[in-house]
From Swiss-Prot:
Organism superkingdom: Eukaryota
Family (UniProt): Belongs to the dysbindin family.
Annotated positions of the Phosphoserine modification: 119-120, 142
Keywords: Phosphoprotein
GO molecular function: ATPase binding
UniProt-listed PANTHER family: DYSBINDIN DOMAIN-CONTAINING PROTEIN 2, DYSTROBREVIN BINDING PROTEIN 1 DYSBINDIN
Region span, Disordered: 79-158
Name the record gives this protein: Dysbindin domain-containing protein 2
Modified residues (Phosphothreonine): 137
Length: 158
């Protein structure tokens, strides 16, 4: 080994002291270092780690939105309150601007109702038995389908 055991012992003690100092520096926090207050206030403005930006979320939301023309009377009857009097072509002062109104409606509800109406009767345990004569009735009716089911379709107020 080493011809001088004393020098080897001193080098080993020096390495042990350096290791001890290294771990003391890491494990003991320095009291003189303080985070600036601006760092704490910016946390709410930073995007969450690993998430997509809010701009991408807004674009995705807009792609899923369907515009409904409120100038179309059939579509407007669903969203506008009913009047007891006969429908007038224009109320005084309310619709002075003939601009087109539109309403944003998410398409996910319509897609869900179509999916449930197209599902097979065998997969739904509560579906009517085809031998009872109820096999041809849909489970859910979408807004676009016209059905005569006794006033379920919104119409003019009476």
């Amino acid at each position: 080994m080493d011809p001088n055991p004393r020098a080897a012992l001193e080098r080993q003690q020096l390495r042990l002291r350096e290791r001890q100092k290294f771990f003391e520096d890491i494990l003991q926090p320095e009291t003189e270092f303080v985070f600036p207050l601006s760092h704490l206030h910016l946390e709410s403005q930073r995007p969450p780690i690993g998430s997509i930006s809010s701009m991408e979320v807004n674009v995705d939301t807009l792609e899923q939105v369907e515009f409904i023309d409120l100038a179309d009377q059939d579509g407007a009857d669903v969203f506008l309150p009913c009047e007891e009097s006969s429908p007038a072509p224009q109320m005084s002062g309310v619709d002075d601007h003939p601009e087109e109104l539109s309403l944003l409606v998410p398409t996910s509800d319509r897609t869900t109702s179509r999916t449930s109406s197209l599902s097979s009767d065998s997969s739904n345990l509560r579906s009517p038995n085809p031998s009872d004569g109820g096999g041809d009735t849909p489970l859910a009716q979408s807004d676009e389908e016209d059905g005569d089911d006794g006033g379920a379709e919104p119409g003019p107020c009476s």
